[in-house]
């Protein structure tokens, strides 16, 4: 009990210091555009590589054993650091908006990001620029973390607009099943899927990249593969594709539809933070047939 009280006290201290610092400081920590501005960039045809706390921590070796479902890899860390500092035409870099703004977050999220900033401040300042324009990687976490839900509908509207009349290629882990069973992809012209390993996808990075490059550049590429997606989005942008590191956006959308107040499991899909990577059977035969018809290739660790 005493340890729990101490931990909560520390969280509260980080939050209060951070809240005061952000309200008083005349120096801008980092320039991070809003979630709406980030979505607008995607609608203009930009690709995005997103860095959450996991990807950022991988760069400065805070997680020596890797992060969930991706083991550590020296080459991967180097690429993540390289892309974080990149300035490629038609490609943007997303970092967490809560590094500079916490007053719109629920308390648990405000505690988390306040502690994250202060315990990683030296490393963050080493790798992040004070002058580079970043975008908000939290487009994939647009609902649950926020007290103000007013932007949610607009973000969803812009997301659907991004897919409208586009041929969409989803490159995802087995059982991710982005957009399956909801209307996110309803306006897309055609949907195809390449399924990849749900764990340690970076081991077959070259194989994944070369397979995608066999596809037409006019397609919108959606990537849901953790830090592997962060790197793929950059390499594909260099090749002339529009590639979006989409992350958990589909799951967030499912929670938004259900007006969930916490992370809950979703039928037919792997929800890493709730059920983990599991092989869920698609019980609806019609839905299963649609899904299987969209799969054009599978890439394994073998």
Model regions and ranges:
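Short, solvent-exposed amphipathic alpha-helical segments in soluble enzyme
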Residues: 65, 110, 183-188, 209, ...
């Amino acid at each position: 009990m005493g340890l729990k009280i101490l931990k909560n006290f520390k969280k509260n201290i980080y939050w209060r210091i951070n809240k005061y610092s952000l309200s008083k400081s005349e120096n801008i920590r980092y320039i991070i555009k809003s979630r709406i501005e980030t979505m607008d960039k995607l609608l203009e045809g930009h690709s995005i590589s997103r860095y959450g706390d996991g990807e950022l921590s991988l760069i400065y070796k805070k997680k020596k054993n890797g992060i969930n479902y991706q083991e550590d890899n020296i080459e991967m860390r180097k690429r993540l650091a390289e892309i974080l500092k990149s300035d490629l035409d038609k490609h943007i870099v997303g970092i967490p908006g809560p590094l500079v703004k916490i007053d719109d977050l629920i308390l648990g999220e405000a505690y988390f990001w306040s502690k994250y900033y202060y315990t990683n401040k030296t490393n963050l300042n080493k790798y992040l620029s004070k002058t580079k324009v970043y975008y908000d990687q939290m487009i994939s976490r647009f609902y649950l973390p926020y007290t103000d839900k007013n932007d949610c509908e607009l973000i969803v509207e812009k997301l659907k607009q991004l897919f409208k009349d586009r041929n969409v290629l989803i490159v995802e882990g087995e059982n991710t099943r982005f957009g399956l069973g909801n209307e996110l992809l309803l306006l897309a012209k055609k949907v195809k899927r390449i399924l990849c390993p749900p764990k340690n996808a970076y081991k077959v990075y070259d194989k994944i990249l070369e397979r995608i490059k066999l596809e037409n550049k006019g397609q919108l590429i959606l990537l849901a593969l953790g830090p592997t997606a962060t790197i793929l989005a950059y390499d594909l942008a260099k090749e002339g594709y529009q590639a979006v590191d989409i992350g958990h956006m589909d799951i967030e959308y499912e929670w938004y539809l259900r007006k969930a107040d916490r992370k809950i499991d979703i039928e037919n899909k792997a929800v890493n933070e709730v059920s983990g990577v599991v092989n869920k059977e698609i019980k609806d035969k019609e839905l299963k047939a649609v899904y299987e018809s969209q799969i054009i290739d599978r890439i394994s660790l073998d």
